[in-house]
């Protein structure tokens, strides 16, 4: 399993950032997430959805579900299918707005390519997570 944890400060209130973080907006902020569909609300206040993701030139289909939702604090989603992962979005109030943190734990879905390819994919995904954070910041501050 690979783990990536990155944060950014956003000049917007926690409530606004949390409310925006729904599956519908994911393709707007996540460049490799090609499609999100079949979004359904869950009794825990979260969602389930299907997705299409492109990594290292390969296309993956899967499903995600919020397994934990603490309003204005955190969401945890579990993804199955093409890429198995757990993604936690944390929202922490800070003086100038919100500290937004994404922690992604995932299984690199290309075992046959070995450690070199895995290192490349992990680095690529670290860069992608920085882009997601920057895009969320841009959407919230405009």
Predicted feature residues:
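Hydrophobic beta-strand positions in extracellular immunoglobulin-like domains
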Residues: 10, 53, 104-106
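Glycine-rich portal/gate segments that line the openings of hydrophobic small-molecule binding cavities
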Residues: 28, 38-83, 131-142
């Amino acid at each position: 399993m690979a783990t990536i944890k990155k944060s950014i400060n956003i000049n917007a209130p926690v409530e606004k950032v949390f409310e925006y973080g729904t599956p519908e907006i994911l393709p707007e902020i996540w460049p490799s997430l090609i499609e999100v569909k079949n979004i359904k609300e869950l009794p825990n206040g979260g969602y389930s959805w299907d997705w299409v993701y492109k990594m290292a030139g390969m296309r993956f289909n899967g499903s995600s579900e919020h397994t934990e939702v603490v309003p204005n604090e955190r969401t945890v989603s579990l993804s199955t299918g093409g890429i198995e992962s757990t993604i936690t979005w944390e929202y922490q109030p800070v003086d100038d707005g919100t500290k937004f943190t994404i922690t992604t734990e995932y299984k690199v879905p290309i075992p046959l390519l070995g450690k070199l390819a895995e290192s490349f994919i992990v680095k690529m995904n670290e860069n992608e997570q920085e882009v997601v954070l920057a895009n969320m910041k841009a959407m919230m501050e405009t």
